[in-house]
Every structure is written in structure tokens, then in C-alpha cells.
Amino acid sequence: MASKRISRELRDMQRHPPANCSAGPVAEEDIFHWQATIMGPHDSPYSGGVFTVSIDFSSDYPFKPPKVNFKTKVYHPNIDSKGSICLDILKEQWSPAPTTSKVLLSICSLLTDPNPNDPLVPEIAHLYKVDKSKYESTAQKWTQKYAMG
């Protein structure tokens, strides 16, 4: 079941790629391990950055969410230093309905609109709330250092 669903999503994504994203298997013979590329949204401090994300599907997919992690360092209240992402649709709000394409679009939205009320990194969330311009300049510096090379 999982491999059929993943194969179908891959075909759909190749036909209709999500905006500013691409994804596919790391190795042709292993459909369960993907690498994605997310372009930093223009209306965010991540603009101009290219972010690599790993997507690991289990044999229980789509009944369990894929494990999605940033491989590129990113300064964000909902993404920690290990690349873990705090996004409700990858946790308690998961349902079998969303496709990988929709998950990637949700991650792009999170880059544009962080959720400081449900942070993985409380210090960054605090800065976002009290000094947004300092948060944005730090995020831009990290983007230049880690995602533009």
C-alpha cells in the first residue's frame, strides 16, 4: 500500500510540481527515502536560500506521517538545530489525505508565517515576538551563510 501511494505521489509531483519546491527519491531503487529542495519564499527572510529537506516514509504511510527534517541549517522558531519541524500536520493533525506536495507547501508557508506560540526553539520565538526586525536580520544572515552556497 505505502509504495503504491508514494509512487503515485511522485508521478503527480513530477506532472504538477508545487511552487518553489522539488522532491524525489534519493536512490531510484528506494522509494521510501526522498530529498526535497525548498526555495526560500520571496516574502520572507529566507528569500534567495535553497533549503534541503529529507523525507522518510514508513511502511505505514499514509496512515503515519513521513519524517521530514531540514538538512540545511535554518533560523526559525519552529525548526530546531537538528532540523526537526514543529508543524501540526506532521504530528497530531496528520491524516492520510495530505500529499507530500501539500506537506512541502505547508513547510513553505511556515517559513513565511512562523508560529511563535508553538515553538521548538523558545528563544527564537521570543525574539520573533519582541523584536521581529532582529529576528528577520538573523534569519537572513543564516540564510546567506547556510542556504546560499
Curated annotation (Swiss-Prot):
Q: Give the catalysed reaction(s), semicolon-separated.
A: S-ubiquitinyl-[E1 ubiquitin-activating enzyme]-L-cysteine + [E2 ubiquitin-conjugating enzyme]-L-cysteine = [E1 ubiquitin-activating enzyme]-L-cysteine + S-ubiquitinyl-[E2 ubiquitin-conjugating enzyme]-L-cysteine
Catalytic residues at C86 (glycyl thioester intermediate)
Q: Name one GO biological process term.
A: protein ubiquitination
Region (Disordered) location:
1-22
Tissue range of expression? Ubiquitously expressed at very low levels.
Q: In which pathway does it act?
A: Protein modification; protein ubiquitination
Statement: the UniProt record of this protein carries the keyword ATP-binding: yes
Q: Which SUPFAM superfamilies match?
A: UBC-like
General function of this protein: Accepts the ubiquitin from the E1 complex and catalyzes its covalent attachment to other proteins.
Can you say what this protein is called? Answer: Probable ubiquitin-conjugating enzyme E2 12
